[in-house]
Amino acid sequence: MESGPSSHLDWARSLEAVLSDRTALDLFQKWLMEYSLPQYLDLYFAIRAFERMTLEGKPEKNQLSKSIYCKFLSSRTGNCEAIPKHFKAPIGEKIRHGIDLEDRAFSHCSSFVVDFLRRQHEEFVRSDEFIEALNKVRLRPLFPKPTVILQMSSSTDSSSSHQNTIRKSGSSKRTATQLTAEALLKTKHDRHTKFGELKLEKMYPSARQPYVCNATTSHNDSAVSSSFSGDAPGAHRSNRLRHLREEQAHQNRDTATVPRVEKQQASSAADQPFDHATENGRRGFSMEITKKLLRHLDKVKMNEEMERRIDDIEECRYTTIDMVNGTEADVDMGGIDEDEELDDYLKMKMTDDSQKGSQNRSPKGPNSGEKEKDGVSKNATFSPAPPPPRDSPRGLISSHLHHHSIHHNTIRPPRRTSKEYPLDISLSRNQYPRHHQIDTNRSLMSQSMCVPGPSYSSASSTFSRDSFAPSPMLKGFAGAPGSSKSSQMYDSSGIGSMAPSAFSATSSLDYKEKRHRKSLPNHHSMMSNSLTTPRKHHKIGKSLSNLITLSYVGSDKIPVVTHVPYDGPMTLAEFKRHFALPTGGQQLFFKTDCEDGSAPFQLLLVRDEHTLLPVFEGRIAAEIR
């Protein structure tokens, strides 16, 4: 170590001062072995030795270069992995081919190592080991100087508050102080008042030569601090702060400040925290907090809206097709089947009408001559006998019309045009009574649509007040005109037994129609679609276990879900019809099991309208892109 008085202070200023001083170098190497990588320090001195041998022309330089490469730079045996490969590759090529290296062969590696050691030096001078070693060197001067000790008295006399005593050391060799627990307790007050806080003592251990200073602590630190401040009651002009500072500077001439190497980190204004001490800083902080809160509120509102839409979709368990088929009407009416309710009503009405005497008497029958002799001809009603079975519906219709041909003049003419009730029968239209025309139309229409006709579509609603009830037809031919539930519920052959009147039937139909119209959201659309869509006569409770979930996610990332009856595999056209999606312009990707098992699922693009869709986890899920 150099003999200069402040050589140890240069250790913190530069790396070169540490590398040129043996004491600092040993300390730096010890710190590297404990906290970092010491091999880069060895490489630095090995490169310096190679350069010196090259300048002196020694033949040992080739062997040294091989050793440096094998120990530090080789990709297999080297331990300096941080050096870039493009610095090490040219050196390895020359050594493998036996080419002598030039003087500056390791210059690039040397510059990289120096930069690395310089960064390590910045951390080293901040460590506790360096500060402790620096204090030890400071406490061992080569030429001891007289010590100045300021004895601080606890007496209340202000004139003797600061008394200086000078002691000269008789020998240059000092004995180490025994820091026992008792000695530390005795000097605790002096150490606290001299150095202020315990953090300072931890960073800088107490010196063997007491430092002359004045207690400049706050008024609230301790009770004894007031006796060392200029505001004490017994203080006078000679003990002012300026006088004490001058005395300290005069008595402590060899005091030097320990340099601190702080790395300056460039930071932008955006990285700086808000200055709450200024109005602008507080305003900026409040604006930033307001923006974050608004973004959070927007997210909360969006999540609530999404949950509300999902709940609405879950509540709507059936699609528009189910509503057209009458499922929603059954739900609104309490789950009562419409046909069963109508049948019960007709039975009750027919029972009431059969118990009353008929006010409308029909004309005389073909056998009225025999009954007039018995005196019963005035109240007799005409009831045609059932016709014999025929092979075709045309024979049944013609036979049925033949029995009623004598009453053709008593039937009201039809009020509707031929456009409303087109018939496919080749017989003449004016050969039929009105109720046979309408009943035949409804039966044929029901056959063409494969839908059973409603129970009130025959005798109970088609004949007028002055007409007769149709004759009961055979059960074997369900498609004959006039064959329905109500036509077989009563017997028209007895005296006093009458079918329901036209007025009662039409009034019950009007009541039922009004009630049914109120229960449906769109009566006109249902009536128009009922001619093309088969009507489902099933209870809702029976179909809940046979439902499948359909869903898709659109471009707005909002899922749309529906539950439909599952009757088998579904095509792409049926899937689009359930959601009323357009036929073209959109690509549907359906979830299916992953083929290679690398993902939970995969997306399958389906374009053909007749392709069967895959079922993934019990549902058919799609994404529109």
UniProtKB/Swiss-Prot annotation:
- Region named Disordered: 153-177, 218-237, 247-283, 350-397, 507-536
Where does this protein have compositionally biased stretches of type Basic and acidic residues?
Answer: 273-282
- Read off the Pfam families from this record: DIX, RGS
Domain RGS spans what residues? 14-135
Main localization is membrane
- Would you name any one GO CC term? beta-catenin destruction complex
Which Gene Ontology terms describe the biological processes this protein takes part in? cell development; negative regulation of canonical Wnt signaling pathway; positive regulation of proteasomal ubiquitin-dependent protein catabolic process; Wnt signaling pathway
InterPro entries named in the record? Axin-like, DIX, DIX_dom_sf, RGS, RGS_sf, RGS_subdomain_2, Ubiquitin-like_domsf
Entry's localization field: Cell membrane; Nucleus; Cytoplasm, Cell cortex
What domain of life? Eukaryota
Composition bias (Polar residues) maps to 162-177, 218-229
Cell membrane is among the record's keywords: yes
Please provide, alphabetically and separated by semicolons, the GO molecular function terms listed in this UniProt record. Answer: beta-catenin binding; molecular adaptor activity; protein kinase binding; ubiquitin protein ligase binding
Q: Which UniProt keywords apply?
A: Cell membrane, Cytoplasm, Developmental protein, Membrane, Nucleus, Wnt signaling pathway
Q: Which positions fall inside the DIX domain?
A: 544-625
Q: How does it assemble?
A: Interacts (via N-terminus) with apr-1 (via C-terminus). Interacts with bar-1 (via ARM repeats), gsk-3, and mig-5.
Query: Function of this protein?
Result: Works in parallel with axl-1 in negatively regulating bar-1 signaling in vulval precursor cells and Q neuroblasts. Inhibits Wnt signaling, which affects tissue specific expression of Hox genes, egl-5, lin-39 and mab-5. This in turn affects QR (postembryonic neuroblast) cell migration, vulval cell fate specification, and the development of sensory structures by the seam cell lineage. Has a role in alae V cell patterning, ray formation in the male tail and axon guidance. Does not affect B cell polarity.
Query: What is the protein's given name?
Result: Axin-like protein pry-1
Q: What is the lineage of its organism?
A: Eukaryota, Metazoa, Ecdysozoa, Nematoda, Chromadorea
